Amino acid sequence: MKKKTLSILSLCIALFAALALVGCGGSASSGGGGSSASKSEGKEKAPVAKKTDFIWFKVEMPKSVGVSDSAGKNADRVQLTFPEDENGSADRFIPVWKKALTTEESHADQAEKKGDTFQWEDGGSVEYNGRTWLVGTYEDNSGVSTLLFTDVEPGSVYVLISNFDLHKKEAEALLNSIEFPDDMAKAVAEAREVEISSIEIKH
C-alpha cells in the first residue's frame, strides 16, 4: 500500500513538473516571440549616410543642393548650389583651399581684402561636427556672404556661403558632414585630373 502511494505520489510530481515545464516553455516562447517581433517591427533601419566624393572633400548632399562647373570643369573647381530664386539665380557653397595660409592667416587675409568696402564683420568661431571654423561676413549687391575657415593639412580651407540664413538647413547639413583628406596637396592634384561630370552625385 505504501509503495502504491509513493508510486502515485511520484507520478503526480512528475506530471506536475511536466505541466510546469510546458507552461513555462509556452509562456516564454509566446512572450519572447512577441517581444522579438515587436522590436523587429518597431526598429527601422537607419539610412546609410551617402557622401559624394569630390576627392579633396566628401560631403552629404541634401536633395535640394546641386553641383556647378561654372568655375571650371574639373573637381578642384567644383561649387555646390542652393535652389534657384525667382530670377533663376542660385546662391552657392564654395570651398577654397589655401595651401600656404593657416586658418587665422586666411581669415585675416579676407578681412583685409573685403575691409570697409564690403562691411566685413568678424563672426568669432563656430563648431560643426567637432570641427572648429572661424567666421567672417561681408555684404555686397548679392546679399550677405559668410566665410568659414578651418585647418587642413597642409594649409587651410575656407567655405564661402551666399546668404547663409536663407539656406541654413542645407548649409548646416553640408558643414556637419564635410570631411577633408589627410593630404590635401595630393588630393587636390588628383582632383585637377578628374572632371566633375564623371563624379557620382549622391543624395
Identify what each model region corresponds to.
Residues G25-A28:
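Bacterial signal peptide processing site
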Residues E44-K50, N74-Q79, E127-T137:
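Short, hydrophobic/aromatic-rich segments at coil-to-beta transitions
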Residues F54-S106, N141:
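Secretory pathway targeting signatures of secreted, lumenal, and periplasmic proteins
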